[in-house]
């Protein structure tokens, strides 16, 4: 049997072996606060997927906009009351070609509630152009993967 064929068979065997399926199991959504707290404190690579349409606009009963996104939790704080706080920021350009800085912050409460805040800033003056806040739940609107 040619060497490249043997290498292909070996690669396929490793790729599809039961040992390689462990990563898929570890990447399942994790629906509770305690598991999330343990994951961040253990230094796990945590990602959040958010679906704002499954959340509510803060202080209202209206659903959020049909926007989905994800982020990797690079830094976090577990505060004295147990709140897990993390944030991200990025520079982007709006559809009208206006450059903006977007600051997104999240707070995960011990009861499984997730508060999502977004602030859009003028990149030259840091003036606030728009703010919005949403209330989500772990497993409904906000899912965590590690």
Regions found by a protein language model. Name each.
Residues 1-11:
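Bacterial N-terminal signal peptides that target proteins for export
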Residues 14-23:
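C-terminal segment of classical bacterial N-terminal signal peptides
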């Amino acid at each position: 049997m040619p060497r490249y064929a043997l290498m292909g068979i070996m690669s396929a065997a490793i790729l599809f072996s039961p040992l390689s399926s462990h990563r898929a199991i570890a990447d399942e959504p994790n629906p509770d606060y305690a598991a999330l707290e343990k994951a961040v404190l253990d230094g796990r690579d945590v990602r959040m997927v958010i679906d704002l349409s499954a959340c509510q606009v803060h202080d209202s009963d209206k659903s959020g906009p049909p926007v989905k996104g994800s982020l990797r939790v690079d830094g976090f704080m577990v505060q004295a009351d147990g709140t897990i706080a993390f944030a991200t920021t990025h520079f982007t350009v709006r559809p009208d070609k206006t450059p903006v800085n977007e600051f997104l912050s999240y707070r995960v409460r011990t009861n499984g509630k997730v508060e999502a805040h977004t602030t859009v800033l003028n990149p030259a003056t840091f003036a606030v152009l728009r703010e919005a806040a949403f209330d989500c739940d772990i497993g409904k609107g906000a899912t965590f993967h590690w």
